[in-house]
């Protein structure tokens, strides 16, 4: 900043642990306020809340203008419900739309699951499509998800607030064109 004779930047911080901790503090002080403190986490940065049902391309359009304002770092993402290689044309459409909208750092999240018993890698819902076993059989499936732009290990290592946020994420259908 010329006015302060200092370098000033703005970071769209993920504040992953703060998203739950600050919420708990605010609940203690202000109680549960509908639409503010009634979930298990705060939406971080300038993201559209993960539970808002809107087309992926619209989400990108809403978040993109903030990338130009956060010169110290930013990310926007689209969450998919399956394997993006099943619809590469739609995947490319999202990537191109991110670029055209001005997204500086974009991510397309999708599930990566592994059955540690039979070694299957792919999308696992309630039962492994390879061997047919379920989580209830005693050894849980490894469910790797992206947080703050990184694959950070299995969900069981995430804090409660971030697990709740991941559970609430609107998953856009891989077999769609992601809407306009």
Regions found by a protein language model. Name each.
Residues 1-180:
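Long, C-terminal-biased catalytic regions of enzyme "large/alpha" subunits
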């Amino acid at each position: 900043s010329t006015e302060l004779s200092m370098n000033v930047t703005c970071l769209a911080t993920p504040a992953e642990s703060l998203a739950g901790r600050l919420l708990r503090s605010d609940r203690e002080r202000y109680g549960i306020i509908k639409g503010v403190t009634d979930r298990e986490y705060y939406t971080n940065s300038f993201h559209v809340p993960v539970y808002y049902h809107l087309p992926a391309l619209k989400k990108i359009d809403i978040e993109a203008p903030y990338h130009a304002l956060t010169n110290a770092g930013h990310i926007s993402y689209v969450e998919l419900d399956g394997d993006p290689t099943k619809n590469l044309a739609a995947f490319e459409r999202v990537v191109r739309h991110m670029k055209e909208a001005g997204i500086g750092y974009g991510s397309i999240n999708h599930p990566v699951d592994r059955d540690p018993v039979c070694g299957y890698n792919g999308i696992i819902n309630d039962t492994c499509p390879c061997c047919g076993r379920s989580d209830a059989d005693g050894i849980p499936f490894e469910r790797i998800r992206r947080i703050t732009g990184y694959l950070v290990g299995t969900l069981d290592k995430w804090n409660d607030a971030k697990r709740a946020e991941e559970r609430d994420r609107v998953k856009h259908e891989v077999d769609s064109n992601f809407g306009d």
